[in-house]
Amino acid sequence: MRHYEIILLIHPDQSEQVPAMLERYKGMITAGGGKIHRVEDWGRRQLAYMINKLAKAHYLCVNIEADQAVMAELEHAFKFNDAVLRHLTVVKKKAETGASSMMKTVEREEARKASQAEFAAANER
């Protein structure tokens, strides 16, 4: 089995359905004998260019270990799901379990927003 990193761009109006979509894809992977090493929800982010007249998309990153049959099934599911704007699958040499640089950026942004909210609340008193 090979290691893969999958990046999904989901339609921003479908952000509420992302957990259900993710569970369906996880089920496909584990049913085929694959393993999930890392799942990251990067949230709604600005796109570099417009896709289907949309400026934002919901990003997901999944690192898995699976065989070719499972990957073909996943690619087929991505292709025929209208909520998936784009998908990218990259073969990796080894499993990656640590936080990605993008996830670290997302966590930093969330921490900055939280500290700004605390600062604003403290200054109102």
UniProtKB/Swiss-Prot annotation:
Keyword Hydrolase: no
Pfam families per the UniProt record, alphabetical: Ribosomal_S6
Segments of skewed composition (Basic and acidic residues): 105-115
Region called Disordered, residue ranges: 96-125
GO aspect biological process, one term: translation
GO terms assigned for molecular function: small ribosomal subunit rRNA binding; structural constituent of ribosome
Coiled coil regions, renumbered to chain: none
Gene Ontology cellular-component annotations: cytosolic small ribosomal subunit
Keywords: Ribonucleoprotein, Ribosomal protein, RNA-binding, rRNA-binding
Matching NCBIfam families: S6
UniProt-listed PANTHER family: MITOCHONDRIAL 28S RIBOSOMAL PROTEIN S6, SMALL RIBOSOMAL SUBUNIT PROTEIN BS6M
Family indicated by similarity: Belongs to the bacterial ribosomal protein bS6 family.
Role: Binds together with bS18 to 16S ribosomal RNA.
Protein name: Small ribosomal subunit protein bS6
Gene from which the chain derives: rpsF
